[in-house]
From Swiss-Prot:
Succinyl-CoA synthetase functions in the citric acid cycle (TCA), coupling the hydrolysis of succinyl-CoA to the synthesis of either ATP or GTP and thus represents the only step of substrate-level phosphorylation in the TCA. The beta subunit provides nucleotide specificity of the enzyme and binds the substrate succinate, while the binding sites for coenzyme A and phosphate are found in the alpha subunit. Pathway: Carbohydrate metabolism; tricarboxylic acid cycle; succinate from succinyl-CoA (ligase route): step 1/1. Residues 9-244 form the ATP-grasp domain. It catalyses: succinate + ATP + CoA = succinyl-CoA + ADP + phosphate; GTP + succinate + CoA = succinyl-CoA + GDP + phosphate. The keyword Isomerase does not apply. GO terms for cellular component: cytosol; succinate-CoA ligase complex. GO terms for molecular function: ATP binding; magnesium ion binding; succinate-CoA ligase (ADP-forming) activity; succinate-CoA ligase (GDP-forming) activity. Mg(2+) binds at residues 199, 213. ATP binds at residues 46, 53-55, 102, 107. It comes from the Bacteria. This is Succinate--CoA ligase [ADP-forming] subunit beta. Belongs to the succinate/malate CoA ligase beta subunit family.
Length: 388
């Protein structure tokens, strides 16, 4: 689950991490009150959306007067934000963040991440802050440092010394850096985060380390342990089908292809996506209905996949160990019989009650093609998608 910037800053503030004053407003009138409260006549106004690239895509405005701040608030609240991280969709802007300008001497990148390569949490740092970390890694690899962490949420003194030396933090700045890193690591572990990113972290001309921007992602599977974080979920920032899938308890991720997939089991679902790609096709979604889905859940799953206007072909790939193939068939038929425009459908059923499942579909008269092979089913689905 992604947090908005202001929510991330709220979380970091609870760990006594230094952040410039900030306020959230949802109208120009609220902005006028905040300006008086903060006592500022210049500042930065930033859209609050679950996407990066805000500065490059008009989502951040530096204002040098009170009137410019108010104009920026009005402008940003009217926009729908889009960047290369929004998958072609535009996100609503319901709130903007106001914060004063600071006198920046140096900018840095600092994050606590899940290091997939080494299978452990890690601290990632760079002396080139304010840039996309992917760009830093590509252009300035010598300016990037990754420090692995232990499962016990400890960071050792020798690692802290390594970091301070790499970042060229001396004297009091080094002491601030040590305390900041310790607090960030603790925050990461305490809240089951999968990402805690500060970009930029700045050293001001007054020699104070400050967090100017923050991004936090919480592990969805751990939210039951964090009810105070769970309520921060903002469905307006998610794909509508992702939101619906969460409500009905399905594992769904929207993708960019045109072949809708309904599969049971995460491993089989990922294999299905891979084999479609091998045959030259592209999936419109990842959808794992699990091993014990009911007929009603299958109906909801089929409807969910077909609600995507990009779906040209439906590929159902079920290996029924616990799953009852007849329930899958009945759910599919129930949805298809209510639709006027049917799309080509490829069905691969194997396992419990497979013959009954095939009979249910065949009796219904809905147009679909059966296959007993995953490879053949994927090839057929791709071929049909290219004919549409």
């Amino acid at each position: 689950m992604h947090l908005h910037e202001y929510q991330a800053k709220d979380l970091l503030s609870s760990y006594d991490i230094a952040i410039p004053p900030y306020r959230i407003v949802s109208s120009v009138e609220e902005g006028e009150l905040v300006l008086r409260e903060l006592g500022i006549n210049a500042g930065v106004v930033k859209v609050q959306v679950h996407a990066g690239g805000r500065g490059k895509n008009g989502g951040v405005i530096i204002a040098k007067s009170s009137s410019e701040i108010l104009a920026a608030i009005g402008k940003l609240l009217k926009m729908r934000f889009e960047s290369n991280q929004t998958s072609g969709e535009s996100l609503p802007v319901e709130k903007v963040l106001i914060t004063p300008l600071v006198n920046i001497a140096s900018e840095y990148y600092l994050a606590v991440i899940m290091d997939r390569k080494n299978r452990c949490p890690a601290i990632m740092l760079s002396k080139a802050g304010g840039m996309d970390i992917e760009e830093v890694a590509q252009k300035y690899p010598d300016q990037l440092l990754t420090v692995p962490l232990t499962p016990s949420a400890r960071i050792y003194n020798y690692q802290l010394r390594q970091i301070i030396k790499f970042m060229n933090w001396e004297g009091d700045t080094g002491k601030q850096g040590v305390q900041l890193i310790k607090k960030l690591v603790q925050c990461f572990y305490d809240n089951d985060a999968s990402l805690l990113e500060i970009n930029p972290l700045v050293l001001t001309q007054e020699e104070e380390l400050l967090v100017l921007d923050a991004k936090v992602t919480i592990d969805d599977n751990a939210l039951y342990r964090h009810p105070k974080l769970e309520v921060l979920y903002d469905p307006s920032q998610e794909n509508v089908r992702d939101v619906l899938a969460k409500k009905i308890g399905l594992s769904y991720i929207a993708l960019d292809g045109d072949i809708g997939c309904l599969v049971n089991g995460a491993g089989l679902a990922m294999s299905t996506l891979d084999i479609l790609k091998i045959h030259g096709g592209s999936a419109a979604n990842f959808l794992d209905v699990g091993g014990s889905a009911t007929e009603q859940q299958i109906q909801e799953a089929v409807s969910l996949v077909l609600s995507d206007e990009n779906v040209e072909v439906l590929f159902i790939n079920i290996f029924g160990g616990i799953m009852d193939c007849s329930a899958v068939a009945s759910g599919l038929v129930a949805v298809m019989q209510t639709r006027e425009n049917l799309i080509p459908t490829v069905v691969r059923l194997e396992g419990t009650n497979v013959e009954l499942g095939k009979e249910i579909v065949q009796r219904s008269g809905i147009p679909c093609q059966f296959t007993d092979s995953l490879n053949e089913g994927a090839r057929l689905a791709v071929a049909l998608s290219k004919q549409v």
